[in-house]
Design a protein with these regions (language model features):
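Structural/interface elements that position substrates and couple domains in central-metabolism enzymes
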Residues: 1-425
Length: 425
């Protein structure tokens, strides 16, 4: 069995999850940060992180961390942590391709006594049913005899400077009791607030996938309530503030549900449920409702424009924000694109402005070229879609100055007071 003294870690995948983890471990023990994209490796070697999760100063502090896109550099590692994406495909089914590819790569350098820990969000059973067989097949080694595994789900919240990897409690697990204890010890090297050792890998997998599923369902409920209250002419935020005076009322808000976690992970759980003969109803209903919010937003906007006698066809709308959440450059699975596409269906021209987002990435992912400068008096409607600090600082007067003399200001994020906008969710 490995010892902490002999530990040499490889972190596979240096994105929003992998890099902060690699940096923290790199302050304590030897670490190789591995990514298949040489451009990412070059960027990190130059001391920069375009995701903005880790500062140049923090990168410098990780004195034992090196970066590589070459598998050969992983041969000396004995503790592998997999932090690759687990997306869904066009049919909203789990796409384990990145996980299988990562497992294949690790299998090529796996040795007797090594431990492989997965952090990527999956359905219960995926580690042992999909990943382990790949490791066995490629390496020729036998699971739980020659090598071992663990699962420790990531809980990174992109853009959150308060909840960082070191101060978020970590779930750990292992394929044997001894390995579970060792995995737990390894993570305790960097997790300052402690760990929770789950009773099995499947329990740890299930815990992760329901964290985001629970949040998704709760937001769906509030979204449905917002639709109901809008029909009744009641301000949803006023209702939620009043209800929030009760100590056990959960403080969710309506909105678009995007990103790489909340809008994706429930499909992993529903896929597994359906494979064992159970059709989940509440989870899928919540997904349908949340996925329909972009269209709902545009419908409400068009109605407001008509009431104000603003010509809809040929109108020009400014969408403030493209990233899936505030103060973050991440545009993966952003639902702002649903608003843009729906506006296009009405022959409305949509400009998107987001100072956080890389323009080349926006063009590559969505075919959108964000505007660089904001011009006053240009728009028939302004949609405040993401609550970036820059937009909050502008205030209602500056936001309205972007509109024509007759325009709609739609506040999706409750940034402004009710009286300062024409519409809000």
């Amino acid at each position: 069995m490995l010892s902490i003294a002999d530990l040499k870690i490889a972190v596979i995948g240096l994105g929003y999850v992998g890099l902060p983890l690699a940096v923290e471990f790199g302050k304590k023990v030897p670490v190789v940060g591995f990514d298949i994209y040489q451009k990412r490796i070059d960027e990190l070697k130059s001391g920069q992180d375009h995701t903005l999760e880790v500062s140049p100063e923090e990168l410098k502090q990780a004195s034992q961390l090196s970066y590589s896109a070459n598998l050969e550099d992983l041969k000396s590692c004995n503790f592998f942590i997999v932090t690759v994406p687990t997306p869904i495909d066009e049919f909203k089914q789990p796409d384990l391709t990145p996980l299988v590819k990562a497992s294949t790569s690790i299998g090529q350098v796996l040795k007797k006594g090594d431990v492989v820990v997965y952090e990527s969000t999956v359905y219960p059973g995926a580690t042992e049913e999909t990943c382990i067989p790949v490791l066995e097949q490629v390496s020729g080694l036998k699971f739980n005899q020659d090598f071992f595994a663990g699962y420790s789900p990531e809980r990174i919240n992109p853009g959150d400077k308060l909840h960082r990897v070191t101060n978020i409690l970590k779930i750990t697990s292992g394929s044997t009791p001894e390995v579970a204890e060792f995995v737990d010890q390894v993570y305790n090297l960097v997790i300052e607030v402690g760990t929770h050792k789950a009773t099995s890998i499947k329990v740890a997998e299930a815990a992760k996938v329901i964290e985001n599923t629970q949040r998704d369902v709760n937001i769906a409920l509030i979204n449905e309530l917002a639709v109901i209250f809008n029909k009744m002419g009641i301000d949803t935020e006023a209702v939620l503030q009043a209800a929030g005076t009760k100590w056990n009322f959960l403080p969710f808000r309506p909105g678009l549900v995007g990103g790489h976690c909340i809008g994706v992970d429930p499909y992993y759980l529903t896929h597994k449920a359906q494979s064992i003969g159970y059709h989940p109803e509440i989870i899928l209903a919540g997904r349908r409702l949340n996925d329909g919010m972009g269209a709902y937003v545009v419908t409400q906007l068009v109605k407001a424009m008509i009431k104000k006698k603003i010509q809809v066809e040929g109108a020009k709308v400014l969408v403030l924000g493209l990233s899936f959440k505030e103060n973050c450059p991440d545009i993966r699975n952003t639902k702002i694109i649903d608003i843009v596409n729906e506006l296009t269906e009405y022959n409305i021209a949509a400009d998107v402005y987001d100072p956080w987002v890389d323009a080349n990435e926006a063009q590559h992912e969505y075919g959108i070229t964000p505007v660089v400068n904001l011009e006053q008096g240009q728009y028939d409607a302004v949609i405040l879609a993401v609550a970036h600090d820059q937009f909050k600082a502008m205030g209602a007067e500056a936001l309205r100055a972007l509109g024509k003399s007759a325009h709609i200001l739609y506040d999706l994020k409750y940034v402004l007071d009710q009286s300062e906008s024409d519409l809000r969710l």
